[in-house]
From Swiss-Prot:
Family according to the record: Belongs to the DNA polymerase type-B family.
Any single biological process term in GO: DNA-templated DNA replication
Protein's UniProt name: DNA polymerase
EC annotation from Swiss-Prot or TrEMBL: 2.7.7.7
Transmembrane segments: none
Coiled coil: none
Reactions performed catalytically: DNA(n) + a 2'-deoxyribonucleoside 5'-triphosphate = DNA(n+1) + diphosphate
UniProt KW keywords: DNA replication, DNA-binding, DNA-directed DNA polymerase, Nucleotidyltransferase, Transferase
Lineage: Archaea, Methanobacteriati, Methanobacteriota, Methanomada group, Methanococci
Molecular functions per Gene Ontology: DNA binding; DNA-directed DNA polymerase activity; nucleotide binding
UniProt-listed PROSITE patterns: DNA_POLYMERASE_B
C-alpha cells in the first residue's frame, strides 16, 4: 500500500494490508538490504578514490545525518560504502543532447559497457557526493528518489493484491476510504496561530459525521453531528477516526487541511500519530514537505489522496474549486460558502453551515471514489506508489514509465537538464498541428472522423525516438524500435486487447467488476499514451527531443491533409479540421455538378436528393475502410459520431448538436467570472436556438428581447452581477479596475477584503469612468444600460451572428427575416 524511508534504522518501511485475516489489518515489513546508489562514468573504481583523495575536501556536516555530527574530519570518500563494476547500455551515448553528431554512437550496434555503480549509506548522500564528482566526469541517475528507485529495481506492482505464492490478482483492491475536510473560524486570511478549527467533516461508507463543539438546534443534519467538548478533543477524535482507514481523500489537503491541522495540534501538544500497523509500535507521524510552490502531506501507512491535483490533471476547467469539479463530474450545483461568512453563520447557529460542511465531505468522498480506480491503474502501469502517482502530472508519469522500461532493458537513463540547458530548451518553438479555417455558418448532417491516437501512432510507425531520430526514414524502418515507440507499442497493444475484451463483455451484457477494471485500465493507458508526444517537448524531460516533437507534428499535418484530400475526392465536403480529426458533410453540389461551388448559393441543397443518416454513415464507413488500408500499420481513422447540425464561427470556436439533443460547445463558452448571468444565459439560448431548431430569427429575437428588457429595466439585478477575484492586495495594483474600486469602497465602509476574495458588482449609470461606477448589489442604483448591451450581452454572441452575416447594428435594431438555407 505505502512506502516510507526510516532513517533511524536505515530501512524502507513497507506497509501492506493483510486481507487473509478475518478482519484485514495493516502490517509493517522492513526492507534493509536495498541501498542507495548512482552511476559514475568510469570502469575503474581506483580512479574514483584517487580523484576524491586529490580533492581533500571535507563535507559540510549540516547536510548529513545526526550520527555524523561529532565527526570533525569527514571526507567525501567516507560516505561511499561500496563501488562495483557493472555492464550497462548508457543511453546518453546514442542521443544528440547538445553533442555533435560525430560524437553520437550508433544505436543500431548498441552494446553494454563497463561503468561504476557507487553505493552510499543514506539516500541524501547521493546528491551530496555527486556534487563533488562534477569535475570528474559524467554521473547518472543521481536524482531518482530513493523509494521510487526501489520500486523500479524490485519490479513491485503497487496497488495490487498478492497471493501467498506471490501471484498478482488484477482486480481493484477493496480499500477502506474516508473523506476529510474542515471548517475554520476566520474573518480574514486563515491564521493557524489564532483561528480555530470549528468543524471536521468526515464521510465514509460506515461513518458520515460533522464533528463540532457547538450545538445547532432544529437542523435536519443533527443526526449527522458528533459533539465534542472543545477544539482539542475535536483534533484527538479526528486522528482516532482517520487512522482506521486505508485511504484518506482531501481536496487541497496537501497545502491546507493537513498543514493547518498539524499547526493547531501543536498548540495543544498533540502529535499527529496515525499508528495503524498492527505489528509495530513505531509512530506514524504525518510528514509535511515542500516541493516548489506546493506542499505534500504524507502519512506513513495510510494513502493520502489529494483530489485537487488529480482534478487539474484530468479535467479541463477554468476554475478548480470543489463546486466547479462537482458540477463537472456529477452535474450538481453544490452550495458555495465564502470562508469569511462562516464566523457569522457559526455565531448565529445558522444550520446552513452544517449542510455545507456535510456536503463538503460527501462530495469529496464521491469524487475520490470516482477517481480512485483510474489512479490505481496509473500506479500499476507506472510502477510507483499511489500516493506519488496521484500527485504526478502526465509528463512525470511518462518519465517514470520510461525509467522502468530503461531499467528492464539494462539501460542507464539520461539525466535531467541543467538550468542552462533547460533555459535553452524552453526557447524552442515549432509549428503545431494543422488547423483548417471552417466553413462559417450553420451546417447540417455532419460526420466526425478522428485518428485514433494520431501522435502515438506516428511515433510507433515511423520509429521516432531520441536515439533513432538521427537516422533517415528508411533506416529507422529496419531498426529496432527506440524506447519511446517500443513503450507506446506495448501500451497501445494492451489497450487494443482490452477494448476487444470490453466489446465481448458488452455483447454478453456483463457489466461486472472485471468490466469496470478493464474500462479504467484502458482509460489510464489512453492518457499515458497520448502524453508521450507532449513529454518529448517538455523542457525538463530526460528523454527531451525537439527534433522528435517537430517531426511528429510535421507528419501529423501530412496525414491529416492527405486524408482530407482523399475524403473530398470520395465525395465529402470538409467543414473544419483540427490536428487529428475533421468534420465533414456530403458534398451534394460536387456530386451533381462535378465540381465545387463554394461561392454559388443559388442552387440550394433542399432541392437535391438527400442521403438518410444511415446511408451517410454507411458511406462514411466505406471511406474509412479504404483509407485505413492505405495508412501505416497501427494508424487508424475512426468514425466518432454523427451530428444533426453544427455552427462554425472560426478556428477553435464551434458548437454541434448530437442526434440525442446533447450540445457540444468548443471555444464559445462564456466561462470566466467576469461575464454576468445575462451574458451567459443569452449566449446559451442563442446557440440552442441555432442548433436545435436551425432558427436564425429566433436567435436574433432572443438577443433583441434581452436588449429590450435591459432598456425597460426588466432584468433582475442579480443577473447583472459581474464577479472578479482579487489576486493581490489592493495596494499592489498599479492600475484601477471595477473590482478594485469596489474593494476600496468595502474597506472604506469598515469591512475587510483579502487576496482571493471574489468581488461581485454592478455597473451603474453615470458620467464617471466604468471603474468608478462599479457598486455592490446593495448599493447599486440604476444600471448602465449601454454598458451591459455593449460589454456583456453582445460580445459573446456577436461573432456567432456575424458568421451568419448578421451585423451588430441589425441586432440592436429591427431587421429582416432570414431563412436557414441562407447560412449554409
Amino acid at each position: 500500500m505505502d512506502l516510507d524511508y526510516n532513517s533511524k534504522d536505515l530501512c524502507i518501511d513497507m506497509y501492506y494490508k493483510n486481507c487473509g485475516l478475518k478482519k484485514p489489518e495493516i502490517n509493517l515489513q522492513k526492507e534493509c538490504e536495498f541501498k542507495p546508489y548512482f552511476y559514475v562514468d568510469t570502469s575503474e573504481p581506483k580512479e574514483i578514490y584517487d580523484y576524491l583523495d586529490g580533492l581533500n575536501q571535507e563535507i559540510d556536516l549540516k547536510k548529513l545525518e545526526p550520527e555524523f555530527e561529532n565527526n570533525t574530519s569527514l571526507k567525501v570518500q567516507d560516505l561511499i560504502t561500496n563501488i562495483e563494476i557493472i555492464e550497462k547500455i548508457v543511453y546518453s551515448d546514442y542521443i544528440l543532447n547538445g553533442k555533435d553528431i560525430s560524437e553520437v554512437s550508433d544505436f543500431k550496434n548498441k552494446k553494454e559497457r563497463k561503468i561504476c555503480k557507487v553505493y552510499v549509506k543514506y539516500p541524501n548522500h547521493v546528491k551530496i557526493i555527486r556534487e563533488y564528482f562534477k569535475e570528474f566526469g559524467k554521473s547518472y541517475e543521481f536524482d531518482i528518489p530513493f523509494l521510487r528507485r526501489y520500486m523500479i529495481d524490485q519490479d513491485i506492482v503497487p496497488s495490487a493484491k498478492y497471493s501467498e505464492d506471490n501471484k498478482i490478482d488484477n482486480s481493484i483492491p477493496e480499500l477502506n476510504c474516508i473523506a476529510f475536510d474542515m471548517e475554520l473560524y476566520c474573518k480574514k486570511e486563515p491564521n493557524a496561530k489564532k483561528d480555530p478549527i470549528i468543524m471536521v467533516n468526515l464521510f465514509s461508507k460506515d461513518y458520515q459525521k460533522v464533528i463540532t463543539y457547538k450545538k445547532f438546534e432544529n437542523s435536519e443534519y443533527n443526526g449527522c453531528v458528533d459533539y465534542v467538548k472543545d477544539e482539542k478533543e475535536l483534533i484527538q477524535k479526528t486522528i482516532e477516526i482517520l487512522k482506521q482507514y486505508d485511504v484518506i481523500y482531501t481536496y487541497n489537503g496537501d497545502n491546507f487541511d493537513f498543514p493547518y491541522l498539524k499547526k493547531r495540534a501543536n498548540i495543544y501538544e498533540i502529535e499527529l500519530d496515525f499508528d495503524n500497523a498492527s505489528n509495530s509500535q513505531q509512530p506514524q507521524i504525518i510528514k509535511i514537505s515542500k516541493g516548489g510552490i506546493n506542499r505534500k502531506s504524507k502519512i506513513p501507512g495510510i494513502i493520502h489522496i489529494d483530489l485537487y491535483p488529480i482534478a487539474r490533471k484530468l479535467l479541463n476547467l477554468t476554475k478548480y474549486k470543489l463546486e466547479n469539479v462537482v458540477q463537472e463530474l456529477f452535474k450538481i450545483n453544490k452550495e458555495a460558502v465564502d470562508y469569511g461568512d462562516i464566523p457569522k453563520m457559526w455565531e448565529t447557529e445558522d444550520t446552513t453551515l452544517l449542510r455545507y460542511a456535510y456536503e463538503d465531505a460527501l462530495y469529496t468522498y464521491k469524487m475520490g471514489n470516482y477517481f480512485l480506480p483510474l489512479e490505481i491503474m496509473f500506479s500499476r502501469i507506472v510502477n510507483q506508489p499511489l500516493y506519488d502517482t496521484s500527485r504526478m502530472n502526465s509528463s512525470q508519469m511518462v518519465e517514470f514509465l520510461l525509467l522502468k522500461r530503461s531499467f528492464e532493458q539494462n539501460m542507464i537513463s539520461p539525466n535531467r537538464p541543467s538550468s542552462s540547458s533547460y533555459r535553452e530548451r524552453a526557447k524552442f518553438s515549432y509549428e503545431g498541428g494543422y488547423v483548417r479555417e471552417p466553413l462559417k455558418g450553420i451546417q447540417e448532417d455532419i460526420v466526425s472522423l478522428d485518428f485514433m491516437s494520431l501522435y502515438p501512432s506516428i511515433l510507433i510507425s515511423h520509429n521516432i525516438s531520441p536515439e533513432t531520430v538521427i537516422y533517415e526514414e528508411k533506416e529507422r524502418e529496419n531498426m529496432e524500435l527506440g524506447i519511446i515507440p517500443k513503450t507506446l507499442n506495448e501500451l497501445l497493444s494492451r489497450r487494443k486487447h482490452i477494448k476487444m475484451l470490453l466489446k465481448d463483455k458488452i455483447q454478453k451484457n456483463e457489466f461486472d467488476e472485471e468490466y469496470s477494471r478493464l474500462e479504467h485500465e484502458q482509460k489510464s493507458i489512453k492518457v499515458l499514451a497520448n502524453s508521450h508526444y507532449g513529454y518529448l517537448a517538455f523542457p525538463m524531460a530526460r528523454w527531451y527531443s525537439d527534433k522528435c516533437a517537430e517531426m511528429v507534428t510535421g507528419l501529423g499535418r501530412k496525414y491529416i491533409q492527405e486524408t482530407i484530400e482523399k475524403a473530398e475526392e470520395f465525395g465529402f465536403k470538409v467543414i473544419y479540421a483540427d490536428t487529428d480529426g475533421f468534420y465533414a458533410k456530403w458534398d451534394y453540389d460536387k456530386l451533381q455538378k462535378g465540381k465545387k461551388e463554394e461561392n454559388d448559393k443559388s442552387d440550394k441543397l433542399s432541392n437535391l436528393p438527400k442521403l438518410s443518416k444511415e446511408e451517410l454513415i454507411i458511406l462514411t464507413k466505406k471511406f474509412l475502410k479504404g483509407i485505413n488500408e492505405e495508412l501505416p500499420e497501427g494508424m487508424e481513422l475512426e468514425f466518432e459520431g454523427h451530428f444533426k447540425r453544427g455552427l462554425f464561427v472560426t478556428k477553435k470556436k464551434y458548437a454541434l448538436i448530437e442526434d440525442d439533443g446533447h450540445i457540444v460547445v468548443k471555444g464559445l463558452e462564456v466561462v470566466r467570472r467576469d461575464w454576468s448571468n445575462i451574458a451567459k444565459d443569452t449566449q446559451q439560448a442563442v446557440i440552442r436556438a441555432l442548433l436545435e431548431d436551425g432558427d436564425v430569427n429566433l436567435a436574433k429575437k432572443i438577443i433583441k428581447n434581452t436588449i429590450d428588457n435591459l432598456k425597460k429595466g426588466n432584468i433582475d439585478k442579480n443577473d447583472l452581477l459581474i464577479h472578479t477575484q482579487l489576486t493581490k492586495n489592493i495596494e499592489e495594483y498599479k492600475s484601477t479596475a471595477p473590482h478594485i474600486e469596489v474593494a476600496k469602497k468595502i474597506k472604506q465602509r469598515g469591512d475587510s477584503v483579502r487576496v482571493g476574495d471574489v468581488i461581485s458588482y454592478i455597473i451603474v449609470k453615470g458620467s464617471r469612468s466604468i471603474s468608478e461606477r462599479a457598486e455592490l448589489l446593495e448599493y447599486a442604483g440604476d444600471y448602465d444600460i449601454n454598458y451591459y448591451i455593449d460589454n456583456q450581452v453582445l460580445p459573446p454572441v456577436i461573432r456567432i451572428m456575424e458568421s451568419l452575416g448578421i451585423s451588430e447594428d441589425e441586432l440592436k435594431n429591427s431587421g429582416k427575416q432570414f431563412k436557414l438555407d441562407q447560412f449554409m
